[in-house]
Amino acid sequence: MRNLSFIVLFLLTLFFIHHLVDASLLVKSLPGFEGPLPFELETGYVSIGESGDVELFYYFVKSERNPENDPLMIWLTGGPGCSSICGLLFANGPLAFKGDEYNGTVPPLELTSFSWTKVANILYLEAPAGSGYSYAKTRRAFESSDTKQMHQIDQFLRSWFVKHPEFISNPFYVGGDSYSGKIVPGAVQQISLGNEKGLTPLINIQGYVLGNPVTDKNIETNYRVPFAHGMGLISDELFESLERSCGGKFFNVDPSNARCSNNLQAYDHCMSEIYSEHILLRNCKVDYVLADTPNIRTDRRRVMKEFSVNDSSSLPPPSCFTYRYFLSAFWANDENVRRALGVKKEVGKWNRCNSQNIPYTFEIFNAVPYHVNNSLKGFRSLIYSGDHDSMVPFSSTQAWIRALNYSIVDDWRPWMMSSNQVAGYTRTYANKMTFATIKGGGHTAEYTPDQCSLMFRRWIDGEPL
């Protein structure tokens, strides 16, 4: 009887674990892409939370080189609340939109030459619930926060590895960009602590990758003014007056300091028409792609009506970098696309970024302590910055890295493309942290994909940049 009870319990446990990750699908083709996919793509849901009330959606792309032995990385898009389609189709995945003008059909896709999946297995996760195709079954489960995300990522991974045991021994990394600068280092720490507590399966965590990482809002805000001056966006006189009147502090300014406030208003005026994610690019308005996306089966006139615009000139032209955001709204909401990806019927309309609709608590105001703890554990890290990003200036990232106070093992130098052209600049520290700038890059990798792909390939293979 005791043996029978044990067998029943064992079978129930296997059934429960299988149920957590049973909604997976091998995707052989996608609407918008001609022919079968030339890479292996799996999508699915993993149930997490106390009662399995959170359903996190993922895209898993196997490495094109040697998936059995190549590293595995989970990629977390910033936001919080932005879809991982941003990573898969905009940043470092194997597909991208062609950028043709929208004609009412499914936007066409094409292969990229710069995918990070050429050398690594990548798991693109839609987190927290409410991001992309992920959802929650109850209002309470829908609530999220910085620390809750970290715990859920750890829980997701251990459930996912149960279903994919062949990848347990692969070197594992956590990657992300923008607001994920707050989440990724904490998730690495959470995974490490889980391993130490004996949580199974053990995750072979080796390090993390961060692009243009939001780390400390005060530091980032403080470095925007000198960045703007260095880029010629404000005058010497205004910069010097800002330095004097504000005492070099440009955040939490004393409202009684009228001179500082007036100077900051002048600074804001100079920056108001600059595209902050990449100061050299055309400032295309993209507010409409952040709100509810339009009905797919509609003509151009109806599209403009739903976007509350009067003429086609109010829509971004295909030459605009952000036009791909417009296309993603139509692609991701197409019924055939959702069916091909295995999206559950409970999921409503897809938004590229759904931040305003997620009940989210911001708890981490400074992520530097997580970097300190991860350095003490001996984890590798790659931190990179586009040098034309004014949202999270590369100089602000350099500042908190210097504050870690680790000795330099490879000092500031250019790193080169294969064509012997300068791709950016790099420095490596004794805590196994590599910092790199991306020449001409913005917020984030998607603006200079060839350089970022080469940087990642060298770093993940243990080569110097």
Swiss-Prot record:
Subcellular location(s) per record: Secreted
UniProt xrefs under Gene3D superfamilies: 3.40.50.12670, alpha/beta hydrolase
Residues spanning the signal sequence: 1-23
Positions contributing to substrate binding: 77-79, 177-179, 439-443
Domain of life where this protein originates: Eukaryota
Annotated disulfide bonds: 82-353, 246-260, 284-320
InterPro entries in the cross-refs: AB_hydrolase_fold, Peptidase_S10
GO CC annotation terms, alphabetical: extracellular region
SUPFAM superfamilies, per database record: alpha/beta-Hydrolases (SSF53474)
Reported regulation of activity: Slightly inhibited by phenylmethylsulfonyl fluoride (PMSF).
Assembly and binders: Heterodimer.
Name of the protein described by the UniProt record: Serine carboxypeptidase-like 19
Biological classification of the source: Eukaryota, Viridiplantae, Streptophyta, Embryophyta, Tracheophyta
Protein encoded by which gene: SCPL19
